[in-house]
Regions:
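Periplasmic OmpA-like peptidoglycan-binding domain that tethers envelope proteins to the cell wall
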Residues: 96-104, 126-211
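A broad, low-specificity signal for short, low-complexity segments enriched in glycine/proline
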Residues: 81-84, 122, 148-153
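Periplasmic peptidoglycan-binding/tethering modules of Gram-negative envelope proteins
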Residues: 1-19, 25-120, 193-211
Length: 211
């Protein structure tokens, strides 16, 4: 009954602990206070959830701006990968169809990639930990391959692309929360310079040599 007045709120009860997650911080805290009054012996924790739609739209806008700011005549592979990693590709559950909203980012990236020689880009797919691990690995590969195939359809040389699926391996957030699962369902890009063989894993914040 308490949750009826709190839309978009998730309650998880584990042993003597209740965890509340929702978009409205004030509403979540008010609900927590009510629960504490009813069950004083339980521990109630609150966490503000993530607005998925807003997060996705902002990430796509950031990626588009980053790609648009690159000089096509002086572009570096790391710059392209960094911009690509700004976007969130939020696949529908169980699907490997690229959302239409992300295609403009991939279009921009493809145009730039065609100007960069001697570079391979590995597209890495990840899922959350929900469901069967083997099925998740298969799905993550299909999603990564979909991204690679789309770039090829826009003129990128297939030899520049490699798709890998890791499934639920290497989580970057807590798989017990909706927000954590959302963050773990992701596509990452890794650049390999074919002249040196050096692989560089790129995120929005950093570049890391991996071998």
């Amino acid at each position: 009954r308490l949750l009826k007045g709190s839309p978009n709120t998730t309650l998880t009860w584990t042993g003597s602990e209740i965890a509340l997650q929702g978009l409205d911080a004030n509403a979540i805290q008010a609900l927590a206070d009510k629960i504490k009054a009813i069950t004083p012996n339980l521990t109630v924790k609150t966490q503000q959830g993530i607005d998925v739609s807003q997060a996705v739209n902002t990430s796509i806008s950031d990626a588009e701006k980053a790609l648009a700011s690159l000089n096509p005549d002086q572009v570096k592979p790391i710059d392209i990968a960094t911009a690509l990693n700004l976007q969130i590709i939020n696949f529908a559950t169980g699907s490997n169809d690229i959302p239409d909203a992300n295609k403009s980012v991939l279009d921009q990236a493809a145009a730039l990639m065609n100007r960069v020689p001697n570079v391979e880009l590995t597209v890495k797919g990840f899922t959350d930990a929900t469901g069967d691990a083997n099925a998740n690995k298969s799905l993550s590969l299909k999603r990564a391959q979909s991204v690679a195939d789309y770039l090829v359809s826009k003129g990128v040389d297939p030899s520049k692309l490699n798709a890998v699926g890791f499934g639920q391996e290497n989580p970057i957030a807590d798989n017990t929360t909706d927000e954590g699962k959302f963050k773990n369902r992701r596509i990452e890009f890794e650049v390999t310079n074919t002249e040196t063989g050096v692989q560089r894993e790129v995120t929005g914040e950093s570049v890391k040599q991996t071998n």
